């Protein structure tokens, strides 16, 4: 993956933004993005993929919407049903990662809009996600996308000696 570096032209480049479902060829870029984005502030445990095969087993092609500019992936939105139960198939659980150099350019919002459209097309009735209480920027982003508080798991994690709440949020898909 070519390095995604901060660049004054990032804002202009977003006019070339594309969004599509993930493909096998994206694995390398997505693994690097995970290593960059998920840390103790954004996840209860850093994500460290040991191999491309492991990554593809956990994140098969089509299980993410990826956003890119030219050939570079600058963000993704992963989605899956929370369990294998038939009674849970109307729900997608989400996670979003945007490269730090491409944040606050509307990429996350465009991914979320695309996800809402895809969910409606696929008969999904509810989107949900979890966010650490120590990540106020992510919480504000999800609220700006219409997500509402569903619950709070108090002191759910102990990260670097600090107890952190896990905030549960949801968005209804009107169908």
Residue ranges and their predicted role:
Residues 1-25, 167, 173-175:
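Conserved N-terminal entry element of GNAT/NAT acetyltransferase domains
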Residues 17, 24-25, 36-101, 112-113, ...:
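Acetyl-CoA-dependent GNAT
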Residues 30, 34:
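Hydrophobic pocket/interface hotspot
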Residues 62, 164-168:
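Short hydrophobic/aromatic beta-strand or adjacent loop that forms the aromatic wall/cage
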Residues 104-117, 140-144:
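Conserved acetyl-CoA-binding loop-helix of GNAT-fold acetyltransferases
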